[in-house]
């Protein structure tokens, strides 16, 4: 996590999108240094990053999303929890240094990312729901 925070703090302020992420990262980093509060990855033991090869066409986003969805279902079936991290996706796609740190090529893009681990909270039951009514035509 230290390396990602350092990359964010080294970015150029001339780009308005980068500057938004830089300011947010500064706040996150300050909290992390002051009290160990990791508000980017929440101290999860694993960060999954789904990467797509954009030179193969626009279907990389669909394929990557479907793959992530299947990973999510498998994780839940094993008693694990996930939390998607769109902030990391956006930051990695505007900051080339993050892609470099991850060993990604120019043709690759981060499709999605999520943290994975055992949830702190377990629910014994869910909210009561009405039976779904639908008709196929």
Task: Please tell me what each predicted stretch does.
Residues 1-62:
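Glycine/small-residue-rich phosphate/adenosyl-binding loop
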Residues 15, 23, 92-96, 108:
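Generic alpha-helical secondary structure signal
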Residues 19, 80-89, 117-124:
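Low-complexity, flexible helical/coil segments
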Residues 34-35, 96-99, 121-122:
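A short, acidic/glycine-rich surface segment
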Residues 35-36, 93, 129-131:
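Residue-level signal for pocket-adjacent positions within structured domains
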Residues 39-42, 102-107:
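Solvent-exposed alpha-helices and their adjacent loops that cap or buttress functional pockets
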Residues 46-100:
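Small-aliphatic-rich amphipathic alpha-helix that forms the alpha element of a beta-alpha
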Residues 104-137:
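C-terminal helix-cap and adjacent tail motif
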């Amino acid at each position: 996590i230290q390396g990602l925070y350092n990359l964010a703090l080294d970015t150029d302020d001339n780009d308005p999108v980068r500057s938004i992420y830089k300011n947010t990262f500064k706040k996150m980093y300050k909290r992390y240094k002051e009290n160990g509060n990791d508000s980017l990855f929440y101290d999860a033991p694993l960060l999954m990053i789904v990467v797509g090869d954009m030179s193969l066409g626009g279907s990389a986003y669909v394929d990557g999303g479907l793959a992530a969805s299947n990973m999510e279902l498998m994780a839940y079936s094993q008693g694990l929890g996930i939390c998607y991290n769109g902030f990391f996706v956006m930051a990695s796609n505007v900051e080339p240094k993050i892609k470099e740190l991850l060993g990604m090529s120019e043709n690759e893009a981060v499709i999605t990312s999520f943290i994975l681990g055992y949830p702190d909270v377990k629910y014994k039951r869910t909210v009561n729901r009405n039976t779904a009514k639908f008709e196929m035509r």
